[in-house]
Amino acid sequence: QKWENHTSISDNVVKFFKQRGISQKTLIECRITEEEYYQPQLNKKTNNIVFNYFYGVTLLNKKFRSANKSFTQCKNAKKVFYGINDIEGEKECYIVEGEMDKLALWEAGYKNCISVPNGANDLNDVFETCGDELKNIDKFFIAVDNDEAGKKLEKALINRLGKWKCSKIEFVNGKDANDELIHSVFSLEDALKNPIDYPVEGTFNAVDVWDDIL
């Protein structure tokens, strides 16, 4: 069967996403676009994948990703979670560290997911803008990267949201949700279906007691 591009973006970009396990259907539904834009790290204009940050019907920000993985955003844009509209009316929410991970969860059927726009940075601004949306969530699943930056973000998120409202998603076949998807969608689904509760201060389990005895 002949390959066809059903999106409004170029074949090369669509094929890049395909290599990362992201389908054309997800690209269309998540409104991924393509645009020439100045990349400060490259000191020139270049073609970019564009992740569009909507808040309601308003496009508040764009994040631009070049072919060599340089990133930039619109200047002075209001900070919001990527995908904030997708948790409207939800009681559970998955939080990831990057737009590709948000798309990975969408691909696996988990649409109630948001991504921080800039790691552990700018969280004050993001929470200020999106506080009303977050206060309606009963349970958060922290699905950030398995590295030092991810641990920093994880700590910042559970401190803000409350450890008792959060569970951790662990990825065993890579550092993040997109790596897990590339391994297989079943691997990603397995990780998402097996969250780990954070121990709350003042509580302990049998292993803790046994360690003390030994």
Label the predicted regions:
Residues 130, 152-163:
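Short, aromatic/basic amphipathic alpha-helical patches
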Residues 166-179:
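Conserved beta-strand -> loop -> alpha-helix junction used to position metal-binding or nucleic-acid-contacting
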